[in-house]
Amino acid sequence: MGCAPGGPCCGPCGPCCGPCCGPCCGPCCGPCCGPCGPCCGPCGPRCGPCGPCGPCCGTMEKRNGLQRCCPF
């Protein structure tokens, strides 16, 4: 999928641009964290296995000693 300024972005803002999770488009999202998971950009830190949850990314839970992001 192509990527253009102001287009779809990653994480809760919209689908990822590019193959897998390539660069994000649009003002609502920052850089993707590649195959690790979606990102939040200005909303907060990256979600998914790459990093902690931000306010727009749902909640953090601990399971079996590992933290992970949960959907809203």
Curated annotation (Swiss-Prot):
Belongs to the MST(3)CGP family. Keywords: Developmental protein, Differentiation, Repeat, Spermatogenesis. Signal peptide: none annotated. This protein is mostly composed of repetitive C-G-P motifs. This is Male-specific sperm protein Mst84Dd. Testis. The gene is Mst84Dd. Pfam families: MSSP. GO terms for biological process: sperm axoneme assembly; spermatogenesis.
